[in-house]
Amino acid sequence: MAETLGLAAIGDEQLTRRYADIVRQEYLAVGIREALSPQADLATEPRWARISGTFGEDPTRVHNMVRGYIEGMQNGTDGLVQGSVIAVVKHWVGYGAAENGYDSHNVYGKNAIFSGNNLKEHIYPFTGAFEANVASVMPTYSILKNASIGGKPLEPVGAGFSHQLLTDILRGQYGFKGVILSDWLITNDCNSDCINGVPEGKEPVPGGMSWGVENLTPQQRFVKAVNAGVDQFGGVTDSQLLVNAVNEKQLTQQRLDESVVRILEQKFRTGLFENPFVDPQKALHTVGRADWQKEANAAQGRSLVLLQNKEGVLPLKRGKKIWLYGIEPKAAQIAGFRVVDSPEKADVALIRAHAPYEQPHKQWFFGRRHHEGSLAFTDDNPDYQAIVKASHAVPTVVTVYLDRPAILSNVKDKAKVVIGNFGVSDAVLFTRLTSSEAFTGKLPFELPSSMNAVLEQQSDVPHDSQSPLFEIGFGLAR
């Protein structure tokens, strides 16, 4: 299936619901009863490392996609019922306004910055989850820097410790009655390796994400989070500190009972006690069904965004000689093309590229996994070198995987065809490139024209960069 950005590029709420419904059935078949999804985060900072899990940066579209996703995952609009998988919408709230694009799994990315005073717009997509009666909410690790509600500044702590965000706004203003599940390890310490990165030769491990409350003890963090509104702690298997807090009269048993009731109610509503087992044979016949894969392939094709098609290069004609980069030769051969070993021998070149990124924080556990930094293709980028090489010799088709909004200025002027993708197989790509049907995918975020424009935009405001190369919602038909 197309990734969530691809579903946003399609823009069909019912398709998103269908996608989540299929996932629900596969999850249930193998015994998964809770999903840490969807992300309702608004991807307003184009450098952010976790855009690929979102539905983009248009508040209305994200709202609608989130609503459809939860209805599919929970088997309807009435909250948890038999056949539901518990959906956990995340990350409440403002996670996508990541300062400098750095993610708050890391100490160097613990802040989301609200210089545009735009928290209200980040809240709006979550109302789609509330309309679908979402079962659970996960707060963000991030400290919302410069953010305020009703003119009152937010306490500078991660959302899992914020009474304002969890009790006053989420439960009070929006009437959320479900489970608040913290993100993982928010009560753990961030030690020196977590703060400074590991020395050369040492393997990094996850540290704690107790942003804003680093001066508290782990037990004090548990108390503060529970008092803020947290019901359940992600990644915690030892409850002794909570027991100690009750025994020391820092928390009441009545308050813990409120959380226990919420958690148990979910288990009862989904039938987990009555029917905790799965049938392995049924699972084998459910997961990866051929008819579902056919639907998934169709969605992948619909999610492709045609950004440029010069000189009528598309659709590609079968039988042509083709030079490939990042594409399996067998897929091209099955599609009816003759694969050659140099652009000079080809009629056309097809290149699969990845949105550019940097990894300046490889000494951190999550930093070494995250795509950070510049969005621009540079001369030493291997994908860009392939584009330059091919475009000197032959009409070139480039498809760029847009896990972040790449700057395509120096790709657009070399390639005849440019296509944005959000996860597409080689087979589906060839089916689409040889089809005469119109493209229907639209960009779920804008593509900036330069890194200067990226640096000047406000991290909490959607699609606000100066003179974008491609505006949000852009997509050619042919």
Segments (PLM) and residue ranges:
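Glycine-rich tight-turn/loop motif centered on a GG-T
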Residues: A2-E13, P46-M65, G101-K120, A147-G160, ...
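Sec-exported extracytoplasmic/periplasmic mature domains
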Residues: R24-I32, I70-D78, T127-E131, R171, ...
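Helix-enriched interaction subdomains in cytosolic or periplasmic regions
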Residues: T54, V246, Q254-L256, V260, ...
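Second-shell residues forming the walls of enzyme active-site clefts
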Residues: E57-G235, Q240-L241, Q254-R255, R262
